[in-house]
Amino acid sequence: MVGGVVYIFSTIGEPDVIEHTGGPAWIVYGELDGNRSDRLKRFHEHFARATGMEGVVSESIRTELWEKSVFISAISGVTAAIRLPDGATRDEKSFWDPFVDSLEEARDAAIAEGVQVTDDIVEERTAFARDLDPGMY
């Protein structure tokens, strides 16, 4: 089975329309078992032809999926609770601390599932959140 992760800043501009709102965008995909199958090679070639975009083949797509989920689950959980955009988490300590706690909890869940996430994932994701351009979220 092939898994994939898309990294993009986007919004739903209107029904059935996803708008890329800024910043880089890329896609990472790979076999869940880490193999480089013929099917994955064909998909990679077809994807590049069909989209004009070069995808990234990962031998550890489960890690990629979890590392994105660590950030998304933390930021979306906190912003849903406070009913404010992403930037509010970095502007107010009472929002930032639960965000960091959520990152740590999601990281721990990945580790409990046997996924090898980067050792400094919490620091990487907090730096990413701090560095976001306000127009990108």
Question: PLM features: what roles do these ranges have?
Answer:
Residues 12, 81-82, 133, 137:
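Short amphipathic alpha-helical interaction/hinge segments
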Residues 110-137:
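C-terminal active-site/capping subdomain that shapes the small-molecule cofactor and substrate pocket
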Residues 1-17:
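Rossmann-like NAD(P)(H) cofactor-binding subdomain of soluble oxidoreductases
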Residues 8, 47-50, 128-132:
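Alpha-helix boundary/capping residues
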